[in-house]
C-alpha cells in the first residue's frame, strides 16, 4: 500500500509537470514530492491510537522497536516527527538535498526495527518485500538529494 502511494503520487506530480506545472518538470523532483506524500501518510501512523487508521498505529509501531532501544513509545513519536520534517524538507528546494540525505540515513536506521519485527513474528511486511522497498526509499531519497548539474539535459534530472 505504501509503495503504491509513492508511485501514484510521483506519477501524478510528473503528469502535472507534463501539463506545464514547472515545479514538477523532472522525474527527480516529482519523486521527491511523491516520497513526501508517502512520508506524511506513514508518519501519521506514529501518532494515532488503535482503530483510527487501517495502517499500523502507535502501539503497533512501538512493538516493532527492538528491546535494546530505550523508550520505544518516545522513539516512535520521534521518528514520526523526523518523517514529517523530512517530508517538508523534500518539498522545499532549498532543503531538499539535506532532507534527502537525512531521510536516507533515517531509512537505514529504521531497517533493524523492521527486521526485528519480522523475526519476532509480528504482523508486518515480510522481509523479502520490506528490504527491497527500504532500498528503494533510500535510493529515491538520495536521488532527491542530488543537486542539478549543468550536464543534466534529460527529464530524469
PLM region spans:
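Membrane-interface extramembranous regions
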Residues: 1-157
Amino acid at each position: 500500500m505504501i509503495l503504491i502511494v509513492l508511485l501514484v503520487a510521483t506519477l501524478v506530480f510528473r503528469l502535472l509537470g507534463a501539463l506545464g506545472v514547472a515545479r514538477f518538470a523532472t522525474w527527480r523532483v516529482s519523486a521527491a514530492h511523491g516520497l513526501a506524500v508517502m512520508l506524511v501518510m506513514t508518519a501519521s501512523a506514529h501518532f494515532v491510537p488503535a482503530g483510527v487508521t487501517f495502517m499500523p498505529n502507535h502501539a503497533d509501531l512501538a512493538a516493532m522497536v527492538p528491546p535494546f532501544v530505550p523508550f520505544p513509545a518516545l522513539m516512535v513519536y520521534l521518528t514520526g516527527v523526523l518523517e514529517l520534517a523530512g517530508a517538508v524538507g523534500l518539498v522545499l528546494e532549498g532543503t531538499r538535498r539535506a532532507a534527502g540525505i537525512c531521510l536516507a540515513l533515517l531509512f537505514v536506521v529504521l531497517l533493524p526495527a523492521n527486521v526485528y519485527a519480522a523475526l519476532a513474528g509480528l504482523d508486518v511486511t515480510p522481509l523479502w518485500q520490506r528490504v527491497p522497498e527500504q532500498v528503494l526509499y533510500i535510493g529515491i531519497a538520495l536521488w532527491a538529494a542530488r543537486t542539478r548539474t549543468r550536464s543534466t539535459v534529460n527529464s530524469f534530472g
